[in-house]
Amino acid sequence: MGGAPDLTNLRVRELLQLEASIVSELRGRGLVRTNNKPLGDIAEQVVLAARGGVLEPNSTKSHDVTDQSGRRIQVKAMGGRVVGRSGKFSRFRSFDFDTAVFLIFAAETFELVLAREVDADSVEAVAPYSRHTNGRQATLRQVESLGLDVTTEMREAFATLDPDAVDLVQ
């Protein structure tokens, strides 16, 4: 099979059913925790696989993973659409974490193309505050050269999430 199946002839209802089935399968594999778009949950699993430690409950404020040394890591993901360098990550409403790991996935293929680890103070310094949303929102342009490049580490962790899967893309 060369890429994703052709979905152009499916009705909207069928597309929604397919999305629900995919999210259900990802939940069954323990990779997502909500019925929201799964990329954020997958990104958290990537960081957990890379760093070990504990995946915090969804209700935990300000960070997603606590690594084995006790560092609190906020995970942000972007992907699935062509956004360019002006693409925005989800908002930061507090900075009670040690580092943020930003994962950027390619549109359509979801290959992990970039991963940056940035300390909380640096994120807060570059992300403008919006009173309307009561948060700070960083763009890809702002974070792509900050902190450490952890792309190789995160790609290796991403590959471990489905070790028995068959690669359908040739």
Regions found by a protein language model. Give the residues of each.
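Nucleic-acid endonuclease domains
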Residues: 1-170
